[in-house]
Amino acid sequence: MANNVVVLGTQWGDEGKGKIVDLLTEDAKYVVRYQGGHNAGHTLVIDGEKTVLHLIPSGILRNNVKCIIGNGVVLSPDALMKEMGPLEARGIPVRERLFLSEACPLILPYHIALDQAREIARGKKAIGTTGRGIGPAYEDKVARRGLRVGDLFDKEAFAEKLKEVMAYHNFQLEHYYNAEPVSYDEVLASVMAQADVLTAMVIDVTQELDDARKRGDKIMFEGAQGTLLDIDHGTYPYVTSSNTTAGGVAAGSGFGPRHLGYILGIAKAYCTRVGAGPFPTELDDAVGEHLGVKGNEFGATTGRKRRCGWFDAVAMRRAVQINSISGFCLTKLDVMDGLKEIKICTGYKTQDGKTLSVSPMAADAYENLELIYETMPGWSENTFGAKTLDALPQAALDYIARIEELTGVPIDIVSTGPDRNETIIKVHPYGE
């Protein structure tokens, strides 16, 4: 039985992680975010009520769960306060159940200004970031000039550090990007107004999680974005700025990697991507329109329309390698209802005739690839809300089985709708 479970995306994000984390946290004591920031968008539907979380772990909707934002997350005080408000208005005691690492880098207004100025400057070569300051905040962290949650304990020292780093960034904004500088006084006043709320939630995350492990408490690590957006292993440079893969758990939370027991990879029954970058199986036809409309494929964070395409087993095999996936959760199976035939990409062929069984990493390597497809019959039956395998048509069962064969990993969970109850659990990650 696994006590410590990782839930992460195996495609380009938006796979439906939030719902699955919420479902499985019925059995967990802790839910931990370990990377990313408020560029994530985790949508939960409980008894018909929709909640979108960007920064706070999805376990916050479970009364028995402690939620932790680990050191690998870049934290925007403004975004956190904005997210806490509606939850607290619903009677959820966020400040009693949410805890922060003092090592979380802060996202401040100058990071957002830089992010947006850079995207404008890139023009047609824009990465397609959310414009929320994620990348610049991670840059500051690596450059060792970033301000962290722990710096807020000494407000005078924080003010001096802020002045220094803002002089650096405002110089870039004014003289390189021809953009307006950010007001030091306004940033300082805003952060100081939030400082006491943030510092009151600080704990020693590594110690807390290790104590929980020793007690036998069940811990869930909630990934954001997806494997193919990983800063190192994704379609570089069209990637996010953090390690979205399983290897990011230990670095982003301080939890020992040897203690991770089960890694659940979330994958849609088809593929989507937001923003620029390679997307080999993308569909610009009626099928792509069907997937986008029926799947309501609009970003939870940006509202941007998602690009849609067939399931890519080649990319999925890469995700299996990187993450050592224990089992898959296949989401949005119901979106495939009504398609006469369904295709799965099983290989990429290069210009020199070589067949690739796993996807390349750099974006340039995707140019001029020929895709190898396998066609399967679709189904007309309605799978929405199915709760047992017996309720699925044979063609859907065959599709699930073929994905298992192509990836070498079992599909342990199938999601057939947005509500936590619209789920088929073949094997529970916690072994229950």
Swiss-Prot record:
Subunit organization: Homodimer.
Cofactor dependence: Mg(2+)
Reactions mediated catalytically: IMP + L-aspartate + GTP = N(6)-(1,2-dicarboxyethyl)-AMP + GDP + phosphate + 2 H(+)
Top enzyme class: ligase
GO molecular function, one term: GTP binding
Positions that bind GTP: 13-19, 41-43, 306, 332-334, 415-417
Active-site residues (renumbered): 14 (proton acceptor), 42 (proton donor)
Cofactor note: Binds 1 Mg(2+) ion per subunit.
Role: Plays an important role in the de novo pathway of purine nucleotide biosynthesis. Catalyzes the first committed step in the biosynthesis of AMP from IMP.
Protein name: Adenylosuccinate synthetase
Binding residues for Mg(2+): 14, 41
Entry's family note: Belongs to the adenylosuccinate synthetase family.
Biological processes, Gene Ontology terms: 'de novo' AMP biosynthetic process; IMP metabolic process
Positions annotated to bind IMP: 14-17, 39-42, 130, 144, 225, 240, 304
Subcellular location: Cytoplasm
Annotated organism of origin: Photobacterium profundum (strain SS9)
UniProt pathway: Purine metabolism; AMP biosynthesis via de novo pathway; AMP from IMP: step 1/2
